[in-house]
Amino acid sequence: MRRSTKLQRLLVFGLIGPIVGLNVWLLTQVYRYFEHLITLLAIAAILAFLLNYSVRFFERARMTRTQAVTVVLLATFTLLVILGVTLVPLLIEQATQLLERIPAWLEASRNNLQSLDSWAKARNLPLDLQGITGRISGQIESQLQTLAAQALSFALGTVSGLIDGTLVLVLAFYMLLYGDRLWNGLIQFLPPHIGIPLGISLRLNFQNFFISQLLLAVFMTAVLIPIFLVLKVPFALLFALVIGIAELIPFIGATLGIGLVTLLLLLQDVGLAAWVGVSATIMQQVRDNVLAPRMMGSFTGLNPIVILIALLVGLQVAGFLGVVVAVPIAGTIKGTLDAMYGTKQTAGVATEIVPRNL
């Protein structure tokens, strides 16, 4: 009997890994099949989360929910149209000019490094700047070819992009109207000690995270544009927007954005690149040490190692969108588990929390 019991335990533990791996693989295949639909739903859900604060503001002004949602979405659509007419053409023009100028920048930087390499060889210094430059230039040129191909496909897919944008707005409209009913219906299928903490944690993590990240990204973009204009940085608007969009990636986004812009400017002017890197880093420190703690606090409570793992998993599964939603999902899981253990230890906590948060 003891041997059979031990054998059963070994079989159970031995099958756990393959079963979990098979389930993960099946979920990955399902995601790949419905990737476009899931992406649209995720973007619409994020937009609904962000706009829900504005909807509540208009509801306090004695508007009905439908009227408030309609006003907010019309204002959002108007803002997007204004940005699309004024800002997007300028960004496309600057991006096109940047792609055209980078080969000339590469040639100029190659010539400068050749003279520096000759100076190092004349003094018997063990430097191979020319070889390093050749490898870096090859990598940049290959990436430029990829970007050019992606730009062409983006131009060809403009119509489908407009259709997707319309679908996102329509989905966000119905999510703002009926999302609570749908979510509460799904939560009811879960046991109360799981469903209630999950709903609270999801709402807190996603709303706090996305609103904070969006405001911090807007801050970086708005502050860096005049700084870059004063420094006479070429493509100031484009570079500031690149850093601002990179800010949406938690933990490492600012470093990636500033590093990319500084690297591109190094090809043209070392002094200008240094000024840009220093000024952007100072603004990043202001953001991280002054604004971010006030806006975000430590609501996720996640270890930095867990954040990095979540970012890598999100990147592998869903690309940029996965990176953006990885941290709030991880924070939701942790918050739910913490609340579940708390409700087990303290009776009646869930019934006290729900009316204040939902």
Model-derived features: where do they sit?
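Hydrophobic transmembrane alpha-helices
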Residues: 44-48, 172, 241-248, 252-255, ...
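Hydrophobic alpha-helical transmembrane segments of membrane transport and translocation systems
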Residues: 273-358
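Anchoring transmembrane alpha helix of integral membrane proteins
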Residues: 1-89, 188, 207, 331, ...
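Alpha-helical transmembrane segments and their immediate interhelical loop/hinge regions
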Residues: 154-266, 270-276
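Hydrophobic alpha-helical transmembrane segments
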Residues: 9-29, 38-42, 67-74, 100-120, 151-168, 214-218, ...
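Membrane-water interface of transmembrane alpha-helices in multipass transporters/channels
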Residues: 33-40, 164, 187, 230-241, ...
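Juxtamembrane membrane-interface segments in integral membrane proteins
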Residues: 3, 54-61, 67, 74, ...
